[in-house]
Amino acid sequence: MAHDHTNGCSDCGNLSRRDFVRTMGGAALAVGSVGAGGLLQAAPSSKSVAETAAAELYGSLSESQKKVIAFGFDHPLRKKISANWAITKPTIGDDFYTSSQRVLIDRVVRGVMSSDGYDRVMQQMEDDNGGFSEYHIALFGQPGQSETGGFEFELTGRHLTLRADGNSVDGVAFGGPIVYGHGISDPKKQLYYDQTQAADMVFKSLDAKQAVAASIGTEPKETAVLLAGKSGTFPGIRVGELSKDQQKLVLATIQTVLAPYRKEDVKEALKVLKAGGGVKTLNMAFYTAADLANDKIWDVWRLEGPTWVSYFRGAPHVHAYLNVGLKNV
């Protein structure tokens, strides 16, 4: 059962104006570096920390373990999107795994997160489902076997999907769609409230006409996060129609969304965004039926473009989806 989050993540919480200004600078710098063409080598590789641990984990599995949690790279389970599911039956804390295998699983999770992001996700797992030991993993493909499709580690459970794929799927950030959340109904106590605050700064920068264009009544279904490509139509206001200062706020929101993850994935995500036409091709929508605190800080919002879907559903608690790629997995 979820309980109130009161500690465990020292850097989580409200986003101060000073922090947001610093984030804006980081976002502008990051997107500028994409334009310089310096991110071609930015994606994770088989030698990245998380992927190295995942390969070691695979090598440690017995044949009986492989029959339960190891699949071909193109298995349908790798493509499923859900905010609450067990990709395989054993939990990390089960006797199914050895203590050394649990250490390796933790190393993968540390490897795909930033320092703050790791603290958040561990607190999230504790609050939402009793901790890291209650989540599930699967392995797809085999390490070093690129000719068979690739190799990917995936962790799932309540409000969480994380992946490490060593760029097995070129042009797809994070190895495919990822999920995060928090089962707390008070927005200001949600672990990812800083993302709502960042989006709210965009909304509060809009003039009356822009606010009408950005405001939508009913949100799309929760799992509507597949990439639509350049032929897609997107809800809300087009970011390219906003002022430069407003676009910087959108960039800062993107950087806030990406902040929990490792630098390699962040850089690849920004590269993919650039390849899709950049931030100006995105639309941003705010779903005004969702206002938990009755404060006109909209709890559900969406950033979407040809290569990007960030869908944050903060009501009745957080279910959030991030899908960044030149194609769907």
Question: Which residue stretches match the model-derived regions?
Answer:
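A cross-kingdom marker for long, charged
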Residues: 44-63, 67-114, 119-329
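Boundary at the C-terminal end of the N-terminal hydrophobic targeting segment
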Residues: 40-42
